Amino acid sequence: MQISVIIPTFNEDQNIGQLVEFILIHGQDSVAEVIVVDGNSTDSTVEVAAKARARVLHCATKSRAAQMNLGAGEATGDILYFVHADVKLVDSFVNDIKDALTSGFDAGCYRYQFDSKKSILKINAYFTRFNRIMCRGGDQTLFIKRDVFEELGRFDERFVIMEDYDFIQKIQKRYKFRIIPKSILVSDRKYHSNSWLRVQLANLTIFIMYLSGVPPQKMARYYKKLLDYR
């Protein structure tokens, strides 16, 4: 069982080196490769990732769905693990993933907590333990058997945002999905330039739009109007 870790990036030179090094150290012989798929960064993300011994791919489109699909297409492992660049994984991620898959699950994620002591963000994090689609998200990372990923048709590249919700919904309709009862650490940077209430209202609005079948490009445009974020 070999794991290919796929990390989509855009201007992540402050995070990517440490993350790649952590994965390679704790992945040992079970991580086949760390693939960083860059979406035209204007900082030194590519150079930092390469120096940390990641395999770097260049995606013409700045879109996590397109970037992750490109990485998956180049991956050699039989397990794909999609990770955002601004998270900190648990040391036991390899064993956790293997245990879940050998126990009959086909895909899964972690709970998370924020790298902040704010009580209100702890409330957000608490809900990631529940098996409800609105409690999911790419920040929780996603592992999946490669054959299941291909059978489901990969990420829908029409979605510039909400690609993770869309794909996890597809998984849960046909396969067993595991939420590992451990928490990874997620950056609270989205809240630095937006209030907690503003982020929650934006997320709720976009989620309702998604469930209502609003076209992906319209959701993306509206989300950019709602939040000041990257």
Q: Which positions does each model-derived feature cover?
A:
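Short, acidic, metal-binding catalytic loop of nucleotide-sugar glycosyltransferases
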Residues: 21-31
